[in-house]
UniProtKB/Swiss-Prot annotation:
Sites where the protein binds ATP: G13, V14, G15, K16, T17, V18, E100, G101, A102, G103
Binding residues for Mg(2+): T17, E100
Pathway(s) per entry: Cofactor biosynthesis; biotin biosynthesis; biotin from 7,8-diaminononanoate: step 1/2
UniProt: substrate binding residues: S37
Full protein name: ATP-dependent dethiobiotin synthetase BioD
Active-site residues (renumbered): K33
Alphabetized InterPro entries for the sequence: DTB_synth_BioD, P-loop_NTPase
Gene from which the chain derives: bioD
Length: 213
């Protein structure tokens, strides 16, 4: 069976969709966003296709497509949809699969279930995407604690933003996690520039080895 990796973030807007596109492209794999909230602009799946170079056949269809760009539990209620979290099972594919969550770990899927509940059931390794800006130490360490409390394997932390040696170092040391690398902000953001930024910041081998802890 090919590797399956869950990408989550310390909060909304950290850059995990761009990171997921880079990772899925580098792995020449598949991508899946279980629940898409917000359809008026480019969806996360469309962004990944545009930036990763993966064809539509490599992007697994969303289980739920909800109109409003809010937390999935509320978006579903506004659409009159009931999310059946038990039906959300990570697909098996013939290439590595990157699964992207929504917002942070405790974003609710329903009034009773969070994304972290889903991750704990899947038992798949998680890559935590974290900013390098002010405030990220607390957010990152809380997220690491939450994953460990549910016995979810942490593949490592992927930083996104400008280099911040002290901030990155204290998160890695206090969180006792692997630093996978850092994805710099890219301007202009294109398939080619993202591919190069990922290659400069990461070792793709770290995402396919058994290193989670």
């Amino acid at each position: 069976m090919s590797a399956r990796i869950v990408v989550s973030g310390t909060d909304t807007g950290v850059g995990k969709t761009v990171f997921s596109a880079a990772l899925a492209g580098a792995l020449d794999g598949y991508y899946w966003k279980p629940v898409q909230s917000g359809l008026d602009e480019e969806t996360d799946s469309q962004t990944v296709m545009r930036l990763s170079g993966l064809g539509a056949e490599r992007v697994w269809p969303e289980a739920y497509r909800l109109r409003t760009p809010v937390s999935p539990h509320l978006a579903a209620e506004l659409d009159g949809v009931t999310i059946d979290h038990r039906a959300l099972e990570a697909p098996h594919t013939d290439r590595p699969l990157v699964i992207e969550g929504a917002g942070g770990l405790l974003v609710p899927l329903t009034r009773d279930v969070t994304y972290l509940d889903l991750m704990a059931r899947w038992r798949l390794p998680v890559v935590l995407c974290a900013r390098t800006a002010l405030g990220t130490i607390n957010h990152s360490l809380l997220s690491i604690e939450a994953l460990r409390a549910r016995d979810v394997a942490i593949l490592g932390v992927s930083f996104i933003g400008e280099e911040n040696v002290e901030t990155e170092g204290i998160i890695i040391d206090m969180g006792r996690v692997k630093r996978l690398g850092r994805l710099s902000y890219v301007t202009p953001l294109t398939r080619a520039t993202l591919r190069q930024a990922f290659a400069d910041g990461f070792d793709i081998g770290d995402f396919v080895k058994e290193r989670a802890r």
